[in-house]
């Protein structure tokens, strides 16, 4: 399953560049959990949708550049640099992501770890 799980995550990361909430949401299970650490946890597809809509509001471009990927079974970890332009600001942020993928290729859990202070310095 590791190769398929890696492809799901790679496709998911690539989908963000289209800024299409429907496409992004199609990757999640209904009861998925998204934790953009250190932010609050988003539980369930409806709450995740609202969170992602908030992230994309004012965003004119976004790209997840995957630097490294490791997978064991249905768990995929990736080191990324997420770059986006929103509200007149350009942000480039190192991120470590952990994804749990179901056997049918949906994301049931997604945790991203990043330095909030680094982000805040770039958006001020």
Question: What residues fall within each predicted segment?
Answer:
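Short, low-complexity N-terminal intrinsically disordered segments enriched in polar/charged residues
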Residues: 1-30, 122-124
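A solvent-exposed, acidic/Ser-Thr-rich amphipathic alpha-helical stretch
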Residues: 21-73
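Short, solvent-exposed coil/turn segments at beta-strand boundaries
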Residues: 24, 72-75, 99-106
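Short beta-strand edge/turn micro-motifs at domain boundaries
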Residues: 98-121
